[in-house]
Curated annotation (Swiss-Prot):
<keyword id="KW-0378">Hydrolase</keyword>
<feature type="binding site">
    <location>
        <begin position="87"/>
        <end position="90"/>
    </location>
    <ligand>
        <name>substrate</name>
    </ligand>
</feature>
<comment type="similarity">
    <text>Belongs to the inositol monophosphatase superfamily.</text>
</comment>
<keyword id="KW-0368">Histidine biosynthesis</keyword>
<dbReference type="InterPro" id="IPR000760">
    <property type="entry name" value="Inositol_monophosphatase-like"/>
</dbReference>
<feature type="binding site">
    <location>
        <position position="87"/>
    </location>
    <ligand>
        <name>Mg(2+) 1</name>
    </ligand>
</feature>
<dbReference type="GO" id="GO:0046872">
    <property type="term" value="F:metal ion binding"/>
</dbReference>
<feature type="binding site">
    <location>
        <position position="69"/>
    </location>
    <ligand>
        <name>Mg(2+) 1</name>
    </ligand>
</feature>
<dbReference type="InterPro" id="IPR011809">
    <property type="entry name" value="His_9_proposed"/>
</dbReference>
<feature type="binding site">
    <location>
        <position position="85"/>
    </location>
    <ligand>
        <name>Mg(2+) 1</name>
    </ligand>
</feature>
<dbReference type="GO" id="GO:0000105">
    <property type="term" value="P:L-histidine biosynthetic process"/>
</dbReference>
<protein>
    <recommendedName>
        <fullName>Histidinol-phosphatase</fullName>
        <ecNumber>3.1.3.15</ecNumber>
    </recommendedName>
</protein>
<comment type="pathway">
    <text>Amino-acid biosynthesis; L-histidine biosynthesis; L-histidine from 5-phospho-alpha-D-ribose 1-diphosphate: step 8/9.</text>
</comment>
<feature type="binding site">
    <location>
        <position position="69"/>
    </location>
    <ligand>
        <name>substrate</name>
    </ligand>
</feature>
<dbReference type="InterPro" id="IPR051090">
    <property type="entry name" value="Inositol_monoP_superfamily"/>
</dbReference>
<dbReference type="GO" id="GO:0004401">
    <property type="term" value="F:histidinol-phosphatase activity"/>
</dbReference>
<dbReference type="InterPro" id="IPR020583">
    <property type="entry name" value="Inositol_monoP_metal-BS"/>
</dbReference>
Amino acid sequence: MSKYADDLALALELAELADSITLDRFEASDLEVSSKPDMTPVSDADLATEEALREKIATARPADSILGEEFGGDVEFSGRQWIIDPIDGTKNYVRGVPVWATLIALLDNGKPVAGVISAPALARRWWASEGAGAWRTFNGSSPRKLSVSQVSKLDDASLSFSSLSGWAERDLRDQFVSLTDTTWRLRGYGDFFSYCLVAEGAVDIAAEPEVSLWDLAPLSILVTEAGGKFTSLAGVDGPHGGDAVATNGILHDETLDRLK
């Protein structure tokens, strides 16, 4: 049993709570949407979900700190810290696209040790904890243990991404397009879904040039517990780099080389 089994159990309870809010407000005619200072959208469901999760964590783990997308928090990454993205994929959420999820992770001295990704509109939930593997349920089915693919050549690989604009802003558009031209298949599954599909072995590479910690924390442990590799573009393990590359491990070094 994982050292963090009780924390994972709490994270799964948090996911249930989140689903009860987000799914109820999805496609609601009275959904309230506003713009944050960075001009990205935030809905009343984002705010209500993070508030509810913070309240439950504060009751269950009063000594733990919390960092969330909507209400901020401690960024020192010492001790035990919960990381929350109430709705990853808010732009999808507010347009009625079902590809969105609540992301919940526990960091121990900055390292993700437990994580849950819950996508109720897709009837899917993924989770992982240190040393206990990566798992997924679909439509309430029995949990299935996940393993990354064994694809060993880029020209046989499937790659998923979110957008091209970020690569251009990093002056890496040409390198990224060259990488995609090399791969067998390119799809824009986007956001959390790309990384979950890497963990499932359905996709071999996922990459983003600009992304926040709360977008990545549970995804990094999901991919690594499934046997994959998760780093920044600079090759640093974990979700703290501000960008991300996840692969089945076999393709990782070559992928990073192509993106330099």
